[in-house]
Design a protein with these regions (language model features):
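Extracellular/periplasmic carbohydrate-active domains that bind, remodel
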Residues: 26-658
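Hydrophobic helical h-region of N-terminal Sec-dependent signal peptides
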Residues: 12-18
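Intrinsically disordered, low-complexity repeat segments enriched in small/polar residues
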Residues: 6-7, 19, 514
């Protein structure tokens, strides 16, 4: 069987997702049916992400032209025919990733070898409230000429909201007063019933200490520049009875977790809430949310702050685990110790009783922008069973906190992640979809639809990561035009066979990677860092229909440039006591125009019906290693062959050079 997977399937799936993101709310970007078809040489699918419009600004994003007759170097944005500016200059003011991306190409990777990336967002400012505007976008060529106009997109700013200052309810920004009650009262009073024009809770000033807070539909929480929302270090301020279950499973019930610092949860959470349970929530501002999870310094005696490649200060948090949390943690220590005092086993207490920064469940239309996210006791931002989610211009500073993912999407639909800076203690952007038979029994929805672009991934276990919870499938993910520098992995897919489901329809293109600490590409079902008891799925997990295109990788210090693994029926039976009817293998992976330099060799097994077209290596002897593969095609200047090998019949081949 030959691989027939191409970009059209993934492109179509993403187009459907983008339509949902644009039509999320009438007040934050008009639905896309006001557009006409644009010429192929013009930018495509211009839209305003749901809830990205406020009373005086809005955000535009778009896709590349379908065809480029000339080299595109930038994009120009027009409002009612008046030129507002160009995307790259605009991002200097609104994207924390942009200066790092510029520095990467100017200083870190200055020899011109790396894949260049496109920047495709624009923040329009100085707008009037409750006013409709018409925008078009043009591609700008190297000679300064411009493409035809995109289709016109019409979008309306929001009405001017009523503003509730947190201080009016007695909140004090002195860093010591516990403000939970005052802040919650401000939030509870901020309703459309009281303020039909919309309502915003504003936290401004200095450092506001608080326990768990709970948001509701149709509101904005803004943390102003200079203000910090600091998590209390007292477990009692995150009451377990207000917490949540990760999944609704009954065969192997999940333990209840405490609430996060910021929450959107039903009062009696049962492990699932459909999107639309809550609606239209914005969490924005130029301030900071600090979870107060860990002490400073990656190790004891280590630097609390380092100076990064841009000369900026980056906080460093303790790399720890269940055995060392008592010495290393703050909130993480106190929550774990409190759970152990209740009689919970120490590893379970550590895994299940630490608070994340945000747990946002069942939200239709969710917008996060501008904030700095720091030091969670557990995860960073978790968006569960939600729909139409945008993360724009966040700064994630959680390195090297244990389990400190940047953002995790679970069983959600339609996500946009752009202009973010990631320096995280775990995965930067992670996707999850349940595990085991429970994903089918409880009819969990797949994690479906994501567009990840124009981000700077600095540190993290993986930049773009799927799994290990793959039970209901993770699908329709596009990651393009990102820079990945010093992450452990670039594209990481992970699961365990009995978790089931898998990952499908992924497009990873036009990304630049440098100094990757481990593997640039990982596809593994032998993930062992997160083991959960579960009734096994009917079929073993699988990764399929993945396209990697126009990517450069310069430098890996430790492991394989591409790692793909699986397991035989016998291995799964021996390791997990589960007998499946087939091996756990992957299929329809296509790498095209991918260049490696100064990397380790590949290690590829349990792969079927896949292609490697114009994949080149510099300074990597014997770059290809295949075994237990079926109909894998190599097509480059050295090879034109299809490879099929048994498990004990490894073939080693030299790699082509560019």
């Amino acid at each position: 069987m030959r691989n027939t997977f191409g970009p059209s399937r993934s492109m179509l799936a993403l187009a459907i997702a983008l339509a949902g993101l644009a039509g999320g709310c009438n007040d934050s970007g008009g639905p896309r049916d006001n557009q006409q078809d644009a010429p192929a040489s013009a930018p495509q699918n211009v839209f305003v992400p749901a809830l990205s419009a406020d009373e005086n600004s809005l955000v535009l994003v778009w896709e590349k032209p379908e065809s480029e007759t000339e080299q595109v170097v930038d994009y120009a944005v027009y409002r009612q025919g008046q030129r507002l500016g160009q995307a790259r200059e605009n991002q200097n003011h609104f994207s924390p990733a942009k200066p790092y991306i510029d520095n990467f190409y100017q200083r870190v990777a200055s020899d011109g070898w790396q894949q260049k990336i496109d920047l495709r967002s624009f923040t329009a400012t100085n707008l009037q409230p409750d006013t409709e505007y018409a925008f078009t976008v043009r591609a700008v060529y190297a000679d300064g000429k411009e493409s035809p106009d995109s289709a016109v997109i019409k979008a309306r700013t929001s009405k001017t909201p009523h503003i509730i200052e947190a201080s009016t309810f007695g909140a004090k920004g002195d860093g010591t007063t516990l403000n939970t009650q005052a802040l919650q009262q401000a939030i509870d009073s901020c309703t459309v019933a009281h303020y039909p024009q919309g309502c915003k809770v504003l936290i401004s000033g200095s450092e506001f200490k608080t326990g768990a807070l709970f948001l509701h539909s149709d509101m904005t929480l803004e943390i102003a520049a200079g203000a910090t929302l600091l998590g209390s270090d007292d477990p009692a301020h995150y009451p377990l009875d207000k917490g949540y279950y990760l999944y609704p499973y009954s065969d192997h019930p999940q333990p209840r977790r405490p609430p996060s610092l910021i929450n959107v949860l039903e009062a009696a959470d049962k492990g699932e809430s459909p999107a639309g349970t809550f609606r239209n929530i914005r969490i924005v501002g130029q301030g900071t949310i600090d979870g107060n999870g860990w002490t400073r310094g990656v190790k004891s005696g280590g630097e609390a702050t380092i100076i990064d490649e841009m000369g900026n200060a980056l906080p460093q948090y303790r790399a720890s685990n269940a055995k060392k949390v008592g010495a290393d943690g703050i909130l993480a220590k106190h929550q774990t110790e409190a759970a152990i005092a209740e009689g919970i086993e120490s590893n379970s207490a550590y895994k299940n009783r630490r608070s994340s920064l945000m747990t946002l469940r069942g939200v239709q239309n969710l917008y996060l922008a501008g904030l700095t996210i720091r030091n969670p006791a557990f995860h960073g931002v978790m968006a569960l069973e939600s729909e139409n989610i945008t993360l724009n211009g966040l700064v994630h500073q959680t390195f090297d906190g244990n389990n400190a993912d940047g953002v995790e999407f679970g069983n959600s639909k339609n996500a946009l992640v752009f202009n973010n800076f990631f320096d995280t203690g775990d995965d930067c952007v992670n996707f999850a979809a349940g595990f085991g038979k429970g994903a089918e029994t409880f009819h969990q929805q797949p994690q479906s639809g994501a567009w990840i672009f124009n981000n700077y991934f600095r540190k993290g276990h993986g930049a773009v990561v799927t799994g290990s919870h793959t039970g209901a499938w993770i699908e329709n993910v596009r990651a393009e035009d990102n820079v990945m520098y010093m992450t452990d992995v670039g594209l990481r897919m992970k699961s365990r066979p009995y978790y089931g489901g898998g990952v499908r329809d992924v497009l990873f293109r036009h990304n630049a990677m440098k100094d990757i600490a481990k593997e640039p590409f990982v596809f593994t079902i032998k993930y062992s860092a997160d083991v959960n008891d579960t009734t096994p799925a009917d079929e073993p997990a699988q990764f399929r229909d993945v396209q990697v295109q126009d990517v450069t990788v310069d430098g890996t210090s430790a492991k394989h440039s591409i790692l793909i693994d699986g397991m035989t029926v016998a291995e799964m039976a021996e390791s997990f006591g589960v007998t499946y009817s087939r091996d756990a293998y992957h299929q329809n992976l296509r790498f095209s125009n991918v260049s490696f330099r100064n990397t380790k060799a590949t290690n590829i097994s349990f792969l079927h019906d896949s292609q490697f077209d114009e994949v080149t290596f510099a300074n990597t002897p014997q770059a290809w290693a295949f075994f237990a593969v079926n109909d894998v095609t190599l097509a480059d200047s050295l090879h034109q062959q299809s490879i099929t090998r048994e498990e004990n019949d490894k073939i080693i081949l030299e790699g082509a050079m560019k």
